[in-house]
């Protein structure tokens, strides 16, 4: 029995109690929101990860870290170093490998990860078909489904399943005046398969069987947005919205079968449209968790897309997004290095917390208040220990040597906090004030 079925039957499980303790909300609210599909536990029940990762309504915003080889760069040691970064900064991890021995790479990443691991199974079967049959779109429906099952058996906790795109939507998008017709790699693979085989989406045709597989492992279906906007000028056009409407129907059927499901979102969205993008998705899908790639509010930010997208991510988090998929400085330019993965993950950790301060209020702001208290006291040791990256903070604090006064090297003897503390002492010792 899956966690949704348990919740619907009124059962309070150890996992629900753990979520309640982790997030600081009553266990009955956890159970109720799981029963409604508004909280998901990202896991593969047969191969639990070392970290408990719930996402959903009134929970802290989580961060996903993408890693993986490419056809141009296959360096497993580098990818395993990225896993270590993800373990430190992230909540979930996706293996998006497209080069090398994909089965071996996936299994090594799962073994090294403390986090629930996700994949995009169509990548593997498309690449295998391309190598064996001289065409990526030559795979059969059974081969695709067998790949999904193989990933589940390996312990994958969530998968991007591009089931929302229809053949009609794909053809019309490719013929349209969109700036970029399709930017989703997996979405383009499914679109190519439908056109090559003159057939409907293989996930949609076999949807009941897909649900059965995920139900067996109580893993999470992440409904991919194949037609997400890859340019801000394409945001919220008929193709993005058309796919979202199809996705909403699939969400309903998944929840009816007791299958955990979340929805993926854009992408590239102007700043003023981000909040209502979240509200629209939540309205159409009944409030299931939303997993968003930023979004990027501009298209000109590379090689600083981790910064540009963190701006959008903070707004989306504040508006109700549950899981943020990070971007790195290499986005739109190439495969990221280990350092770039870390830079992206830290930017998104900051964005997630900024959103939580709005979304969760005082509960999230307690951390900030504590840091500010120590900052006001010039208690550098305690303040630095509470910061998001204490090691880096200490390096900056001492980069010109240990300050000669209690203040830092920016203000030195003219530090307002130092002067304020001195004035407080004078006020306290004076009988005339």
UniProtKB/Swiss-Prot annotation:
Any single biological process term in GO: thiamine biosynthetic process
Keywords: 4Fe-4S, Iron, Iron-sulfur, Lyase, Metal-binding, S-adenosyl-L-methionine, Thiamine biosynthesis, Zinc
Positions of Zn(2+) binding: 268, 332
Short name of any one Pfam family annotated for the protein: ThiC_Rad_SAM
The keyword Isomerase is assigned to this record: no
EC number: 4.1.99.17
Keyword Iron-sulfur: yes
Cofactor(s) in the UniProt record: [4Fe-4S] cluster
Pathway(s) served: Cofactor biosynthesis; thiamine diphosphate biosynthesis
Highest taxon of the lineage: Archaea
Binding site for substrate: 66, 94, 123, 162, 184-186, 225-228, 264, 291
Catalysis: reaction(s): 5-amino-1-(5-phospho-beta-D-ribosyl)imidazole + S-adenosyl-L-methionine = 4-amino-2-methyl-5-(phosphooxymethyl)pyrimidine + CO + 5'-deoxyadenosine + formate + L-methionine + 3 H(+)
Binding site for [4Fe-4S] cluster: 408, 411, 415
Entry note: cofactor: Binds 1 [4Fe-4S] cluster per subunit. The cluster is coordinated with 3 cysteines and an exchangeable S-adenosyl-L-methionine.
Function per UniProt: Catalyzes the synthesis of the hydroxymethylpyrimidine phosphate (HMP-P) moiety of thiamine from aminoimidazole ribotide (AIR) in a radical S-adenosyl-L-methionine (SAM)-dependent reaction.
NCBIfam families the UniProt entry points to: PRK13352.1 (NF009895), thiC (TIGR00190)
Protein name: Phosphomethylpyrimidine synthase
Chain's gene name: thiC
């Amino acid at each position: 029995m899956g966690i949704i079925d348990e919740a619907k039957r009124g059962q309070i499980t150890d996992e629900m109690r753990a979520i309640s303790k982790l997030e600081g909300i009553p266990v009955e609210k956890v159970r109720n929101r799981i029963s409604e599909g508004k909280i998901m536990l990202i896991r593969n029940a047969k191969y639990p990860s070392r970290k408990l990762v719930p996402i959903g309504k009134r929970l802290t915003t989580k961060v996903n870290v993408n890693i993986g080889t490419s056809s141009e760069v296959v360096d497993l040691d580098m990818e395993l170093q990225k896993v270590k970064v993800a373990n430190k900064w992230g909540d979930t991890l996706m293996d998006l490998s497209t080069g090398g021995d994909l089965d071996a790479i996936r299994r090594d990443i799962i073994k090294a990860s403390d986090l629930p691991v996700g994949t995009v199974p169509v990548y593997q079967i498309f690449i295998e078909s391309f190598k064996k049959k001289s065409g990526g779109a030559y795979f059969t429906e059974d081969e695709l489904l067998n790949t999904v099952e193989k990933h589940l058996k390996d312990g994958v906790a969530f998968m991007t399943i591009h089931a929302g795109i229809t053949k009609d939507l794909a053809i019309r998008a490719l013929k349209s005046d969109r700036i970029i017709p399709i930017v989703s790699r997996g979405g383009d693979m499914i679109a190519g398969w439908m056109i090559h085989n003159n057939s409907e989406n293989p996930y949609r045709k076999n949807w009941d069987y897909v649900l059965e597989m995920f139900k067996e492992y109580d893993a999470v279906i992440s409904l991919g947005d194949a037609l997400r906007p890859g340019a801000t000028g394409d945001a919220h056009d008929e193709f993005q919205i058309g796919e979202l409407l199809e996705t909403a129907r699939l969400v309903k059927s998944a929840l009816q079968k007791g299958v955990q499901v979340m929805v993926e979102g854009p992408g590239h969205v102007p700043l003023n449209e981000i909040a209502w993008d979240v509200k629209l998705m939540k309205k159409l899908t009944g409030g299931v968790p939303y997993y968003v790639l930023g979004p990027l509010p501009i298209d000109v930010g590379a090689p600083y897309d981790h910064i540009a997208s963190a701006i959008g991510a903070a707004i989306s988090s504040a508006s109700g997004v549950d899981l943020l998929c990070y971007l790195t400085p290499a986005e739109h330019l190439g495969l990221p290095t280990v350092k770039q993965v870390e830079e992206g993950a830290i930017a998104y950790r900051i964005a997630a917390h900024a959103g939580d301060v709005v979304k969760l209020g005082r509960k999230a702001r307690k951390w900030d208040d504590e840091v500010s208290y120590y900052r006001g006291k010039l208690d550098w040791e305690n303040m630095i220990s509470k910061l998001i990256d204490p090691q880096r903070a200490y390096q900056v604090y001492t980069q010109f040597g240990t300050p000669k006064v209690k203040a830092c090297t920016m203000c030195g003897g003219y530090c307002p906090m130092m002067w304020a503390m001195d004035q407080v002492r004078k006020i306290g010792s004076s009988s005339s004030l």
